[in-house]
Amino acid sequence: MWQIRASAGCHSSPGKDKEVTLENTMNFSDIYHSDEEYFRKLKDLRAAHAEAMVKLEKMYQDKLTMKDIQAALVGDDSSSSASEKSCSHPALSATSLSEPDLDRSSSLSTTTDELPDLEKKTPGEIGTRSYAKELINNMWNDFSVEDYTQYDSDLQTAKKNRKKPKAWTPRITVPVPFEMTVREQKRREKASDAQETREKMLKRNEDDAECKKKFRANPVPSRLLLPLYEDLVKQNEERRKKTRERSKAALLASQKPFKFIAREEQKQAIREKKLRELCRAKKKPKQFKARPVPRFIYRPPANVKPKREELYGDSRTQPKARDVLQSSPWPSHSTYRAFRDPRSPAMPRGKHRHRRLSPSDQGLEKWKEPFSEQSFRNCPVLCDQCCLYESLCDSNKRQKILADIRMGEEILKETRRPNPSPRHKSPRRSAHASARPCEYSPPMPTASSRGREQAIRRSEKARMKELARIGGAR
């Protein structure tokens, strides 16, 4: 691959002594399949590649040198004097290959011959500007005007010998538009001018027609009937303010108060309530308020239980006694007398004696009265055998006390405040006790109950007197 590149580089550089080709560097017939032969060929290829690279580098340097020389010549020609400019025409014509007087100019031939000699003498210093100036100065050393003078004979022979010169062809082409293009452009410009003139005339005619028309006022635009901008801004501001207040109130309503604020509000409410109660207490006189009846009053006494048991036994024996009494025969007078005589020795004394009654005895009806059907129908003992009444006297007293308590409660309801009190429960308790007499007995009169009744009576009398006085005053 390196040999191919080297050969390509050598072919691209004209005028060289030797050319490295692919056939000279690589001969496949000489290659053996041994390692030593392979490495030897590899070294040869590397050496050939290095030699080709050196040649390419030298060619590149020569090319750069020629470019520097041409640039220096162009710079010195532009800075030369006016006399040199007048004499530069024959020199330039001598350097050009197309001029016929190339053989006559000896000075120019010397300059062209000196260039390669100078390149051979100083190949490393050509790139500098000082060398270029020295070279230009040496070109004008052997210059003479006589070399450029021509005689008439020479001119005639030159005219005969010379062929017809060719026309001068400039190297820079100046573009000139075609006549057709120019004509098309003029026609286009003329059409655009005519169009503009036509539009101006139309616009002028329209303006004249508008001016000639009779004036007619247009209706009032609708935008004038709309409210002013200041009014709209004011309305929006009011609406925004109301919305802000509404949202603020909603936020305050949804906001939970702090604990100490709620506690202070509760304390303030309690203080106000106490002040109101104090004012009411000062205005109204203090009313009597009795304590509730103790519960032990409704409890049955200790001697009620044996009485209940005795009465329960009597209630069981009374039906049997009634049946025996109805079925037993009437006793005789002798037996009756013996039964009635307490001193009779025949009858034993004690609790086993039985009383014998005659049909004519007035006490028979009295004896049968407790066992009548009316008494058994009204007596709740037979209906509820577990609950028994006590004596009639005790029940009357109890009913009287309960009636007094009810009357006192009704009187107190009229003069009492609307809020409920513990005394309201006493009528229900008394009614329950009256409905269940077997479990509760009516309360016994005490000193406190008697004092309460007297106070109720006194207050009732005072109220009646006050009502009578007010009615008389009216």
Curated annotation (Swiss-Prot):
<dbReference type="GO" id="GO:0005876">
    <property type="term" value="C:spindle microtubule"/>
</dbReference>
<dbReference type="GO" id="GO:0000235">
    <property type="term" value="C:astral microtubule"/>
</dbReference>
<dbReference type="GO" id="GO:0042802">
    <property type="term" value="F:identical protein binding"/>
</dbReference>
<keyword id="KW-0969">Cilium</keyword>
<dbReference type="GO" id="GO:0032391">
    <property type="term" value="C:photoreceptor connecting cilium"/>
</dbReference>
<dbReference type="GO" id="GO:0044782">
    <property type="term" value="P:cilium organization"/>
</dbReference>
<dbReference type="GO" id="GO:0001917">
    <property type="term" value="C:photoreceptor inner segment"/>
</dbReference>
<comment type="subunit">
    <text>Interacts (via central region) with CFAP418 (via N-terminus); the interaction is direct. Interacts (via C-terminus) with microtubules. Interacts with LCA5. Interacts with CEP290. Interacts with SDCCAG8. Interacts with FAM161B. Interacts with POC1B. Interacts with CEP78. Forms a microtubule-associated complex with POC5, CETN2 and POC1B. Interacts with CCDC15.</text>
</comment>
<keyword id="KW-1017">Isopeptide bond</keyword>
<feature type="region of interest" description="Disordered">
    <location>
        <begin position="308"/>
        <end position="364"/>
    </location>
</feature>
<keyword id="KW-0970">Cilium biogenesis/degradation</keyword>
<dbReference type="GO" id="GO:0005813">
    <property type="term" value="C:centrosome"/>
</dbReference>
<feature type="region of interest" description="Disordered">
    <location>
        <begin position="78"/>
        <end position="126"/>
    </location>
</feature>
<dbReference type="GO" id="GO:0036064">
    <property type="term" value="C:ciliary basal body"/>
</dbReference>
<dbReference type="GO" id="GO:0005814">
    <property type="term" value="C:centriole"/>
</dbReference>
<protein>
    <recommendedName>
        <fullName>Protein FAM161A</fullName>
    </recommendedName>
</protein>
<dbReference type="GO" id="GO:0072686">
    <property type="term" value="C:mitotic spindle"/>
</dbReference>
<keyword id="KW-0832">Ubl conjugation</keyword>
<keyword id="KW-0963">Cytoplasm</keyword>
<feature type="region of interest" description="Disordered">
    <location>
        <begin position="412"/>
        <end position="474"/>
    </location>
</feature>
<dbReference type="Pfam" id="PF10595">
    <property type="entry name" value="FAM161A_B"/>
</dbReference>
<comment type="function">
    <text>Involved in ciliogenesis.</text>
</comment>
<feature type="compositionally biased region" description="Polar residues">
    <location>
        <begin position="325"/>
        <end position="335"/>
    </location>
</feature>
<feature type="compositionally biased region" description="Basic residues">
    <location>
        <begin position="422"/>
        <end position="431"/>
    </location>
</feature>
<dbReference type="GO" id="GO:0097733">
    <property type="term" value="C:photoreceptor cell cilium"/>
</dbReference>
<feature type="coiled-coil region">
    <location>
        <begin position="188"/>
        <end position="250"/>
    </location>
</feature>
<feature type="region of interest" description="Disordered">
    <location>
        <begin position="185"/>
        <end position="210"/>
    </location>
</feature>
<dbReference type="InterPro" id="IPR019579">
    <property type="entry name" value="FAM161A/B"/>
</dbReference>
<dbReference type="InterPro" id="IPR051655">
    <property type="entry name" value="FAM161"/>
</dbReference>
<dbReference type="GO" id="GO:0060271">
    <property type="term" value="P:cilium assembly"/>
</dbReference>
<keyword id="KW-0175">Coiled coil</keyword>
<dbReference type="GO" id="GO:0008017">
    <property type="term" value="F:microtubule binding"/>
</dbReference>
<dbReference type="GO" id="GO:0097431">
    <property type="term" value="C:mitotic spindle pole"/>
</dbReference>
<feature type="region of interest" description="Required for interaction with CFAP418">
    <location>
        <begin position="274"/>
        <end position="454"/>
    </location>
</feature>
<comment type="similarity">
    <text>Belongs to the FAM161 family.</text>
</comment>
<feature type="cross-link" description="Glycyl lysine isopeptide (Lys-Gly) (interchain with G-Cter in SUMO2)">
    <location>
        <position position="413"/>
    </location>
</feature>
<feature type="compositionally biased region" description="Basic and acidic residues">
    <location>
        <begin position="450"/>
        <end position="468"/>
    </location>
</feature>
<keyword id="KW-0966">Cell projection</keyword>
<feature type="cross-link" description="Glycyl lysine isopeptide (Lys-Gly) (interchain with G-Cter in SUMO2)">
    <location>
        <position position="397"/>
    </location>
</feature>
<keyword id="KW-0206">Cytoskeleton</keyword>
